[in-house]
Amino acid sequence: MQKGPLSLATVSHTETFWRKVGPKRDGLGTGDGLHSWVLQEPVSTGDNPRECDSQGTSKDTLVREGKTYKCKECGKVFNKNSLLVRHHQIHAGVKTYECQECGKAFHEKVDFVRHMRIHSGEKPCKCVECGKVFNRRSHLLCYHQIHTGEKPYECSECGKTFSYHSVFIQHRMTHTGEKLFGCKECGKTFYYNSSLTRHMKIHTGEKPYKCGECGKTFTYHSVFFRHSMTHTAGKPYECKECGKGFYYSYSLTRHTRSHTGEKPYECLEHRKAFGYHSAFAQQSKIHSGGKNL
């Protein structure tokens, strides 16, 4: 399709730009490659006027010549003015998309759409191995490694391997003891800012995840996800010794100790060992004079 000239310079840094649009895509597939171009409304990007030497230059030429737009706040660069305008909204605190269910707001439409799946229960991403469905493609990709057994990340300190890079990085910090993020409410420290953000929900009481089956709400998505499994038929984790089923893998691990006799928790005061951490913690509390460890 023939595209006309593209004007990028107006007074007071107000710029007109073209936006590329294409066919709607699903969560996992790709488009058919057919796109069109539409003219956006002029958008002001700040109070600093500047001259642009690209009047009459097509968008394709701008990309080929390496024309970039730089954010004066953080230095991030973009090859499209439209992306810079959208990026500026982050610094300005503008959140265009607001959820009518819970009031949470988002900068980007794609984040808003993902969030709405929490309320609607929509799960468009399906595992081809077992049929399990997810509301995000990233969750599906992580889950799929259960079937492949792939653990490409190995700790050089202890040799332990991990399926996910984020878990591997967090494990590495357990060797260094480094915790960078502290809670201002209670002083608890964390390896990651994301962990601190999750922790803060305890203080705020926020429970954004609601079960569509029973209405129960949860602070964390992981707990909500495990709870949702209780409504599905069957218990995926089964004991090979007695056939008892469990919803969670850690429950099966605890149960297996009743068959193996394993007692991994040892009290250093009188060398007594325990099969479960809860029993060990109770014993340790006695030695510490009733103080929580």
UniProtKB/Swiss-Prot annotation:
SMART domains: ZnF_C2H2 (SM00355). Keywords: DNA-binding, Metal-binding, Nucleus, Repeat, Transcription, Transcription regulation, Zinc, Zinc-finger. May be involved in transcriptional regulation. Its main location: nucleus. It holds the Pfam family zf-C2H2. SUPFAM superfamilies: beta-beta-alpha zinc fingers. It comes from Macaca mulatta (Rhesus macaque). A zinc finger (C2H2-type) spans 69-91, 97-119, 125-147, 153-175, 181-203, 209-231, 237-259. This is Zinc finger protein 80. One of its GO terms (cellular component) is nucleus. It is found in: Nucleus. The gene is ZNF80. Belongs to the krueppel C2H2-type zinc-finger protein family. One of its GO terms (biological process) is regulation of transcription by RNA polymerase II. GO terms for molecular function: DNA-binding transcription factor activity, RNA polymerase II-specific; RNA polymerase II transcription regulatory region sequence-specific DNA binding; zinc ion binding.
